[in-house]
């Protein structure tokens, strides 16, 4: 009987080792979803009224910007970026009429964290005019978003993941 018990225990141990050995190994590319990879910036966002907003700085001023994948150009309000005299005057035709606007180089920082991976700074021309954005100060459009290799909205963790090209 003891021989049968020893064989049974040995068989269980062997099956356990085989089961453990057959588990897939975790490779370096399989870090948890919240791990920050090189070239990634994880910018916190909030959702209000089915829209995604990020805290930002525009020319050093605090701002709340709407992320709009349907907007071709990044557009800002005059109260956020008062324009200086510029020759880049344009007319923007909208559903409710036309607005005089200007194409102006602007300094942006998306995200307010001091952590390098949790904000992203860049310069980009933007359209500045007497636009109304509800509770936002401006819109980040595809001209900015398409400058990244990928843009992922992680709603579970409330971050937008910007992967540099």
Regions found by a protein language model. Name each.
Residues 1-7:
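N-terminal secretory signal peptides that target proteins for export/translocation
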Residues 2, 15-165:
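Pepsin/retropepsin-fold aspartyl endopeptidases
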Residues 7, 12-14:
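Short hydrophobic transmembrane-like helices used for membrane targeting/insertion
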């Amino acid at each position: 009987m003891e021989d049968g018990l020893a064989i049974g225990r040995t068989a269980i141990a062997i099956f356990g080792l085989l089961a453990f050995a057959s588990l897939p190994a975790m490779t370096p590319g399989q870090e948890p979803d919240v791990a920050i990879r090189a070239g990634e910036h994880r910018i916190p966002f909030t959702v209000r009224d089915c829209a995604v907003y990020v805290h930002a700085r525009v020319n050093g001023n605090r701002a709340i910007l709407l992320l709009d994948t349907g907007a071709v150009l990044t557009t800002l309000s005059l109260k956020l970026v008062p324009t200086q005299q510029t020759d880049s005057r344009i007319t923007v035709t909208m559903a409710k009429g036309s607005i005089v606007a200007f194409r102006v180089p602007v300094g942006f920082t998306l995200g307010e964290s001091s952590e390098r991976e949790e904000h992203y700074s860049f310069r980009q021309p933007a359209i500045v005019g007497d636009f109304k954005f509800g509770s936002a100060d401006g819109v980040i459009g595809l001209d900015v978003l398409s400058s990244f290799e990928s843009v992922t909205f992680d709603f579970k963790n409330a971050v937008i993941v910007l992967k540099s090209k």
